[in-house]
UniProtKB/Swiss-Prot annotation:
Residues 375-429 form the FBD domain. SUPFAM superfamilies: F-box domain, RNI-like. This is FBD-associated F-box protein At4g13985. Disulfide bonds: none annotated. It comes from Arabidopsis thaliana. Pfam families: F-box, FBD, LRR_At5g56370. PROSITE patterns: FBOX. Residues 18-64 form the F-box domain.
């Protein structure tokens, strides 16, 4: 009896939630359901007679072709069911506007899809004034989803998210409402197709580019926008493209590129945040040559372009290039940087103080580490003593290998002994055993602190 009562009590809130949903006005209900995958919206039809056909009225579709894969082998009836479902949805209430159309193209291996239907669907959603269009092709090259011309002149489109699709060249692009573009593994047909797309978006605010394919036609990626606020660029390992960005209102820049030798920023005065993992095509294959002036000039101009940022994330690979450059030329001052995060992939910390000297107003520093266990450490922080006169907060975020504890303590000692106004230092030891952690804490207590108000926290 007690178990039955407990079961009834635990089930009641769920029923109450269903009742509350049933009593919602249609406009609010549809807004909630718009955030669910369409297959889950269809499942709601069993909960209420009112919801039997509710999926037809939701102003958006979020569908995976794979949702119709029932059998372990291909059956044409499944694809016909997919076609029928989408055509019914687009045909019903066809005069209303669509807020979202998200289609993930995934299907049985080695089965070709009739992608002509996708073009008809895209044309239909453009006619219904779609606001957010997300197309993800996950057939890995078996089928090529082509974005039709109508999409390039869709006046209602606000965001465009494309994955592994084909973008043909267009002589005319007009997307007057488009604010967000995400391009992931997108293939462009001809030279200037990418540039044409960006230039046809007069109110574009956010552009994210991840491993796009320019078909070996272009030698550069050109981004010119008077409205752009955020730009993220992740290059393919095989790309050797020059990247040129002219965006006078740009506030945020993310750059992840190991091959590109040149990244040119024009009108960079508004840049506030930067996330940089960029080595100017230098590394194990091409080492920094202090006598090669073109590379030095490119690095100098790039650093000057970053000199106005307030928040910066930088990789140890980029820091290494900056360190090499600093041995032949003076670094520009990063007077506005108040927050800095450095992601280390090795123990080359000797380059850190050089860069910190160029950040005279730095207040918060976070150090992350992704170092394989057993990797040898290096002597750190050689040279004359350098006081850190503005630093208030230090956090060593990601735990390192336990065998690196002595080297880690040297790094902690550096900040405690050289930071004049340090208020808080946080040390993460989550990967350490209790005994090891106890030893480290005891050693921490013996390290002198230049700042009398500094507190050390161990997590």
């Amino acid at each position: 009896m007690e178990e039955d009562r407990e079961s009834r009590v635990s089930a009641k809130p769920s029923g109450d939630r269903v009742d509350r949903l049933r009593n919602l006005p249609d406009c609010l209900l549809f807004k909630i359901l718009l955030n669910l995958p369409t297959k889950d919206v269809v499942k709601l039809s069993v909960l209420s007679r009112r919801w039997r056909n509710v999926w037809r009225y939701v102003p958006g579709l979020d569908l995976e072709c794979g949702d119709f894969m029932v059998r372990e082998y291909y059956d044409s009836s499944e694809f016909n069911a997919l076609l029928g479902f989408v055509y019914r949805f687009l045909g019903f209430n066809s005069e209303s506007c669509l807020q979202k159309f998200k289609l993930t193209v995934n299907w049985y291996d080695d089965v070709q899809l009739e992608t002509v239907h996708f073009t008809e669907w895209f044309n239909a959603v453009v006619k219904r004034k779609v606001q957010h269009l997300h197309i993800l092709d996950k057939t890995w090259g078996r089928d090529e989803v082509v974005i039709p011309p109508t999409v390039f002149t869709c006046g209602s489109l606000i965001s465009l998210n494309l994955y592994d699709v084909y973008l043909p060249n267009r002589e005319f692009v007009s997307l007057p409402s488009l604010k967000v573009i995400v391009l992931d593994a997108v293939v462009f047909d001809e030279d200037f197709a990418f540039e044409m797309l960006v230039s046809g978006c007069p109110v574009l605010e956010s552009l994210s580019v991840n491993k796009i394919n320019l078909n070996d036609i272009s030698e550069s990626v050109q981004v010119s926008s008077q409205s752009l606020l955020s730009f993220s660029y992740v290059a393919d390992d095989d790309d050797y493209l020059e990247v040129v960005i002219d965006a006078p209102r740009l506030h945020y820049l993310k750059l992840n590129d190991k091959r590109t030798a040149s990244f040119i920023m024009k009108n960079h005065g508004s840049l506030l945040k930067a996330d940089i993992d960029f080595v100017f095509n230098l590394g194990s294959e091409y080492m920094f040559d202090p006598n090669y002036l073109p590379t030095r000039h490119i690095i100098r101009d790039f650093l000057v372009g970053l000199s106005g940022v307030k928040d910066m994330i930088i990789s140890s690979s980029t820091l290494q290039v900056i360190y090499d450059y600093s041995r032949c030329e003076q670094l520009p001052l990063f007077r506005n940087v108040s927050f800095l995060r450095v992601e280390f992939a090795d123990y080359r910390w000797e380059m850190l103080p050089i860069f910190l000297e160029s950040c005279p107003n730095l207040k918060s520093l976070v150090l992350g580490f992704s170092i394989p266990p057993g990797k040898e450490g290096a002597n750190i922080l050689p040279g004359p003593r350098r006081f850190l006169t503005s630093l208030e907060y230090v956090k060593i975020a990601k735990p390192m290998a336990a065998e690196a504890s002595e080297i880690k303590l040297k790094l902690v000692s550096y900040f405690l002994e050289n930071s004049t106004i340090l208020k808080k230092l946080t040390l993460c030891l989550r990967n350490f055993r209790e005994k090891e952690e106890s030893v480290i804490v005891k050693k921490l207590l013996t390290i002198p602190r230049l700042s009398p108000s500094c507190q050390v926290f161990v997590l």
